[in-house]
């Protein structure tokens, strides 16, 4: 899948990216030569993990923490209220 314009990492320090379109489970995305396989469907406008985020660790967007993982979040997983607290 060509991942051009389907998602964005807003800041280089972010451990998340935002889906610009709805993305399907098992899609393989390329970010600067790094490949990511999505573990679940990601709705448009929602975040997914670019790296494993351990329970209690910061979820980073805009280069700053926006919340904390309430459980381990594997790379390629959807990040939302079910696994993150602000």
For each feature predicted by the language model, list its residue ranges:
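Metallocofactor- and cofactor-centric catalytic cores in central/energy metabolism, strongly enriched
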Residues: 1-86
């Amino acid at each position: 899948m060509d991942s051009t314009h389907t998602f964005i990492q807003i800041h280089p320090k972010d451990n998340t990216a935002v889906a610009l379109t709805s993305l399907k489970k098992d899609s393989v995305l390329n970010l600067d030569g790094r490949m990511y396989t999505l573990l679940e469907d990601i709705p448009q406008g929602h975040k997914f993990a670019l790296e494993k985020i351990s329970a209690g660790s910061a979820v980073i967007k805009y280069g700053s923490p926006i919340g904390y993982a309430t459980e381990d979040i594997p790379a390629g997983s959807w990040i939302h209220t079910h696994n993150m607290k602000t």
